[in-house]
């Protein structure tokens, strides 16, 4: 929690500008290429990482495919996972996230900017439609990030049980 407060206070004067720009990109996503939107997210991410005095070390970057059309399936250990992945990933990607996160003001704009798919875990039909849409987009060359556990792990660095539906997109695309 201290790191989050440190990020906010160190970027206090940047927040209104960053918020406005993020909202603009999110509401006019069709005007900007995926690369331009990703560069904005990387810029905001860099500000947050520097503000929080975080050091992010990426390993295995050579394993990321050179051509687009892949899915990441990392473990979700904490609040900084997505910051770290955006920081080290050289290519743009989108995410599949639970729809409850659209109630969080900043995340709502980030997901809109990424053109993320929001999944309703209580609606099986909608969840399957999201998976079908992800399959189509991966085949078309778009990259995705899916936390296969479905939620953040609260007990440290121990992976939880993976949700079966998350791998359907990978096996079918």
Spans of features found by a protein language model:
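Membrane-anchoring hydrophobic helices of lipid-metabolizing enzymes
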Residues: 1-70
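Soluble catalytic domains of membrane acyltransferases
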Residues: 55-173
């Amino acid at each position: 929690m201290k790191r989050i407060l440190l990020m906010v206070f160190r970027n206090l004067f940047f927040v209104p500008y960053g918020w406005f720009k993020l909202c603009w990109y999110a509401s006019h996503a069709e005007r900007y290429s995926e690369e331009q939107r990703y560069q904005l997210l990387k810029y905001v991410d860099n500000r947050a990482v520097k503000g929080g005095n975080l050091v992010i070390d990426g390993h295995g970057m050579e394993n990321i495919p050179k051509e687009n059309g892949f899915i990441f399936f990392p473990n979700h250990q904490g609040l900084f996972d997505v910051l770290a992945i955006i920081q080290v990933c050289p290519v743009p990607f989108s995410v599949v996230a639970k729809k409850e996160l659209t109630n969080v003001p900043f995340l709502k704009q980030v997901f809109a900017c990424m053109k993320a798919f929001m999944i309703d875990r209580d609606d099986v039909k909608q969840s399957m439609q999201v998976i079908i849409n992800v399959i189509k987009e991966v085949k078309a060359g778009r990259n995705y990030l899916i936390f296969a556990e479905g939620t953040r792990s609260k007990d440290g660095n121990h992976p939880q049980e993976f949700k079966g539906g998350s791998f359907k997109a990978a096996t079918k695309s």
